[in-house]
């Protein structure tokens, strides 16, 4: 009898793998059959900022409206001019930190001067791609992955004037939530994460509660594309996270006066609507991960072992890449 049971086990594993492969392929077909416009809610609010606006005023607008990014508009050319994100404010902080004598320049900086800041501190600008809202959703996902961005602007064109129209901005989170809400196939994604090769485990940056905020900001700048730094205790156990968007709340009271604060002190100023730290283990399944995305506003999962030690990071970009390109 034991020998017979052993023979059945590989078949069970093969079934799980086959079901996952077919499920991913089905989700991919779903993404190809839908447009970016299909993801948008029936009604929504969109904040678009003119490139002549002062950076400090744009920060206040983002905070007052509880958003972390906004499309930019060049009134002179009547064209979309990029996206304003927390990374732009981090770049300005870096510039001011290394050039304290330029305080007045930073205080009068307009949004159209952010590219000059990038060049001054040696930051490679992001490739901000856009897409027409009626193009396939799959195409929008691929463009996001190729440009290393977590969001993509949807740009239409007025038929009479031929001028561009900013329709909305689509995020990886919104796309994956759309998948989780509409694709029943996710229940077949039962392979453990450790088998999928989608967890980042090498060179995971971290900090502690006592780490100066400016050190964490420098980590966010140097890493490129990283939007958060996990906070661990002396033993390496995960206790919290410092996100790029936390920088916005830190500098709202003045122009970068509190960079000497520790991470722990800075977190005291965090907004009350912080979603929390989401964790998983390498034994969790994508089905449960996407179920969490369906229920909660989550942007990444920190992978921990059974004792709570940080072992890796699983981003929404990692999940999206797997759905787009794996199991083909």
UniProtKB/Swiss-Prot annotation:
Keyword list, A-Z: ATP-binding, Carbohydrate metabolism, CBS domain, Cytoplasm, Nucleotide-binding, Nucleus, Repeat, Transcription, Transcription regulation
Membrane-spanning intervals of the chain: none
Keyword Cytoplasm belongs to the record: yes
SUPFAM superfamilies (UniProt xref): CBS-domain pair
GO cellular component: cytoplasm; nucleotide-activated protein kinase complex; nucleus
Domain CBS stretches: 42-103, 123-186, 199-259, 268-328
Binding positions for AMP per the UniProt entry: 150, 227-228, 315-318
InterPro entries: AMPK_gamma/SDS23_families, CBS_dom, CBS_dom_sf
Protein family according to the UniProt entry: Belongs to the 5'-AMP-activated protein kinase gamma subunit family.
Task performed by this protein: Adenine nucleotides-binding subunit gamma of AMP-activated protein kinase (AMPK), an energy sensor protein kinase that plays a key role in regulating cellular energy metabolism. In response to reduction of intracellular ATP levels, AMPK activates energy-producing pathways and inhibits energy-consuming processes: inhibits protein, carbohydrate and lipid biosynthesis, as well as cell growth and proliferation. AMPK acts via direct phosphorylation of metabolic enzymes, and by longer-term effects via phosphorylation of transcription regulators.
PANTHER family per record: AMP-ACTIVATED PROTEIN KINASE, GAMMA REGULATORY SUBUNIT, LD22662P
Name under which the protein is recorded: 5'-AMP-activated protein kinase subunit gamma
Gene coding for it: SNF4
